[in-house]
Amino acid sequence: MKPKHILLAYSGGLDTSTALHFLKRHFDCRVTAYCANLGQKEDWERMKRRAAIAGADELVIEDLRETFIGDFVFPALKANASYERDYLLGTPLARPAIVKGLIEYARKHDVDCLSHGCTQKGNDQVRFEMAAKILAPDLPTVAPWRIWSLQSREDLFAYCQQHGIPVESRPDNLLSHDENLVHITTEGDYLESVANAFDWRDANWITPPTQAPDAIETITLGFRRGVPVSVDGAALGPVELVERLNEAGARNGVGFQDIIENRINGLKVRGVFENPALTILHAAHRKLEKITLGRDVERLRNLVSDDYGDIVYRGLWFSDERLCLQALIDESQKYVSGDVKVQLYKGSCTPCAVESEQSLYSRELVTLHAGRAISGEDATGFLNTLGLRIGIEAARAGNTGAGA
């Protein structure tokens, strides 16, 4: 059935501007462009003009920054979530935030079809459509990349030139970027050859470590139940806190990653990520957990962290499995409150001191000096008990103590 009102997730870039024009021509129906403000640096007036030229009946811009950080980034931070123990999930966390806003708008404005500008080769089509299937299974999705004849970014640029759509991409600069409040990515062009080193002239946020200040900068992060709430003693909201850490990390060369990851479809892809705030937050959060989580709780949390990151990466933020893991994670964080000092210096991020009223660390019990010492009698009893199982296993193996 031909749609009457398509709602397109719109970034204003080459892909979605081409998609907008294509949808309007191909379906000849109302097309609303929906842009979620997740903290990307954008000329909103220019975006409005571009969307109008590309054929949008309306451009909607919604500020989702607080929702993005508070409801998506911070819950994942509590899990220390990453993908393949490397990628800090800046894009996979953004996609469900966008889809949630998109569908909430769709429900209020008689939208009968969703659309996106994700390519048929990448991960984002999965993230968009899995989230949409969970939140709005009744709304179909149309993906221009899967039905038009265009095959490359060069083709898209030529299409926009042909139809007078102003885009910032150039045929001689085909790097692709995705930006939000917690990271900016750089992909494509010369980076598609893993033999090529990243050219620091293409960095967007981060000062090259060799050009960063020669003095260490120390900041103090405050956490409450696993959630960051302050910087240097000043209580901050989620957006302002992340912005402050981005500035501090970027000027000190912190948060650069050059990653080769395994896509959802199994193919390997290379991306460069600049995520100063996330890098600082992850380091500080892990340090605080070291004194506030019991050994076995920490081990259990670590067991699910990889699964959590994999679930988010595969576009299943709204799935039952993510919600189950989140309940466990949230319970693990009830004592993760305190302050962490972090040193930033020429690309390094080093937690150097930590304090918490919920600390399980007892200096008195572990000191090398006089204190509440564990007696020799206590230690002997502990070792005898600890060795019972090992002794039984050794006897079974025939280890009589006579040598090999």
From Swiss-Prot:
Pathway: Amino-acid biosynthesis; L-arginine biosynthesis; L-arginine from L-ornithine and carbamoyl phosphate: step 2/3. It is an enzyme of class 6 (ligase). Its EC number is 6.3.4.5. GO terms for molecular function: argininosuccinate synthase activity; ATP binding. L-aspartate binds at T119, N123, D124. InterPro entries: Arginosuc_syn_C (IPR048268), Arginosuc_syn_N (IPR048267), Arginosuc_synth (IPR001518), Arginosuc_synth_CS (IPR018223), Arginosuc_synth_type_1_subfam (IPR023434), AS_cat/multimer_dom_body (IPR024074), Rossmann-like_a/b/a_fold (IPR014729). ATP binds at A9, Y10, S11, G12, G13, L14, D15, T16, S17, A36, G117. L-citrulline binds at Y87, N123, R127, S176, E261. HAMAP family: Arg_succ_synth_type1. Belongs to the argininosuccinate synthase family. Type 1 subfamily. Homotetramer. This is Argininosuccinate synthase. The lineage of its organism: Bacteria, Pseudomonadati, Pseudomonadota, Betaproteobacteria, Burkholderiales.
